[in-house]
């Protein structure tokens, strides 16, 4: 009887361990896929543009335009100052490290963190390689143009939006427990 109980516990631990490994593989694949898609898209855009600010008209609301961004997502915090550039790069590095630790948790948020890390790694590599990040997606409605952005920015933003939605709609009980 005791032997069967011990065997059942070890089988449960084995299944749990296999599930953790499977989830880690999924999260790593998500990060790597986002990073790879981002880097390939940037490589392609850089290769077809001869000059910065050249335009490729795709539709009535979408263009490709190469912009070199020294700030963070959507051109925010672009100071043209080496100190701030280095500070932002250092902060991004530490945010990626923190998110990698959060990804190890086995909860729904870890997949959203994986999306953020995939995008952040793509932009971080560009900051190191090019000293700026190539942005190229120019979404606009008539003459109103949104910030020019890239694939990495999309996944960072999507991950953050998913985290916010999860907190607002799916973690109501946790917020009530803290009160």
Place the predicted regions along the sequence by residue:
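Alpha-helical transmembrane bundles and membrane-interface segments of multipass inner-membrane proteins
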Residues: 2-179
